[in-house]
């Protein structure tokens, strides 16, 4: 770090701005940074590109905020204060929130399937009863109460191949209803993203502290910002890639909706395992 300090004092800081962005990109590719959890979360909720961008930016925002809090707080609290000393506590807090999110995803999927099944069964039975004898009454009576069945069977004729697939179409409509972004609010997405970025980056904290000690506060802030931009590019790319993959799979693979009904279970289990690992790692770091 001595050479780095010398270069800063010589006025060669402009060279480090693009380098900081590149390092942020590479740093985001390292293990961790919640890339696995973000991708699993986007796949589980069948998220849009907009939601993926929001998730990545939220993770970057919290990651940057933690760097500033630790660097500035450490200067005033104790000279022996380091990123390594506070990291286990942040990991433990993150693990608790992540495990709660995994449990919420699992419970939400199970409840959605149970409620969807309860709503579909009487609707299907009544529909088959009235379709043949009271076609006009069906349009009038069920427009409000069983809209999801009306949509899924729209334009079907008795005996057609589409009619035989009506049950599968009803399932597809139910998937779209359950995983529409109205059920997963922007606040929940932001909370998950903010949680994923709580783990601090010792390298970024060290650079910021050096800049502050050299009375180059503006430069330090700029470099941390550039580092965060690079990190955001990686995290957003991961989320957008997951969102596009979900959309393309839904268009090109007829069996995707069947898999999508079970995907949230696997995603919540995967997120839960990551949370457990993070919690154990944080706990072991605390007791050492």
UniProtKB/Swiss-Prot annotation:
GO CC annotation, single: plasma membrane
One of the record's GO molecular function terms: monoatomic cation efflux transmembrane transporter activity
Name used for this protein in its record: Nickel/cobalt efflux system RcnA
GO terms (BP aspect): cobalt ion transport; response to cobalt ion; response to nickel cation
Region feature Disordered, mapped onto this chain: 125-144
Function: Efflux system for nickel and cobalt.
Key word Disulfide bond present: no
Keywords recorded for this protein, A-Z: Cell inner membrane, Cell membrane, Cobalt, Cobalt transport, Ion transport, Membrane, Nickel, Nickel transport, Transmembrane, Transmembrane helix, Transport
Domain of life: Bacteria
Alphabetized InterPro entries for the sequence: Ni/Co_transpt_high_affinity, NiCoT_RcnA
Family: Belongs to the NiCoT transporter (TC 2.A.52) family. RcnA subfamily.
Periplasmic side: 1-12, 73-85, 210-223, 288
Topology of this chain in the membrane: Multi-pass membrane protein
Spans through the membrane: 13-33, 52-72, 86-106, 189-209, 224-244, 267-287
Cytoplasmic-side positions: 34-51, 107-188, 245-266
Entries under Pfam families matching the protein: NicO
Composition bias type Basic residues, residue spans: 125-137
């Amino acid at each position: 770090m001595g050479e780095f300090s010398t270069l800063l004092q010589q006025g060669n800081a402009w060279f480090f701005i693009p380098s900081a962005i590149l390092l942020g990109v590479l740093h985001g590719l390292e293990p961790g940074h919640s890339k696995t959890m973000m991708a699993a979360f986007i796949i589980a909720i069948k998220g849009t590109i907009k939601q993926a961008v929001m998730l990545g930016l939220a993770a970057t925002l919290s990651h940057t905020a933690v760097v500033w809090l630790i660097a500035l707080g450490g200067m005033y609290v104790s000279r022996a204060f380091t990123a390594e000393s506070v990291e286990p506590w942040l990991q433990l807090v993150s693990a608790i929130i992540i495990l709660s999110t995994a449990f919420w995803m699992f419970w939400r999927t199970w409840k959605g399937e149970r409620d969807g099944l309860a709503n579909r069964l009487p609707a299907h039975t009544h529909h088959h009863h009235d379709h043949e004898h009271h076609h006009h009454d069906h349009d009038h009576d069920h427009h409000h109460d069983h809209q999801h069945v009306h949509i899924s069977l729209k334009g079907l004729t008795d005996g057609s191949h589409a009619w035989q697939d009506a049950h599968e179409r009803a399932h597809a409509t139910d998937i779209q209803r359950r995983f529409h972004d109205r059920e997963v609010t922007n606040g929940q997405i932001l909370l998950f993203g903010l949680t994923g970025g709580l783990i601090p980056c010792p390298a970024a904290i060290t650079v910021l502290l050096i800049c502050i000690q050299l009375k180059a506060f503006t430069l330090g802030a700029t470099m941390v910002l550039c580092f965060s931009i690079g990190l955001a590019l990686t995290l957003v790319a991961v989320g957008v890639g997951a969102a596009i993959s979900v959309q393309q799979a839904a268009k090109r693979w007829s069996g995707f909706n069947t898999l999508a009904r079970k995907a949230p279970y696997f995603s919540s289990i995967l997120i839960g395992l990551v949370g457990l690992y993070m919690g154990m790692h944080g706990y072991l770091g605390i007791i050492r």
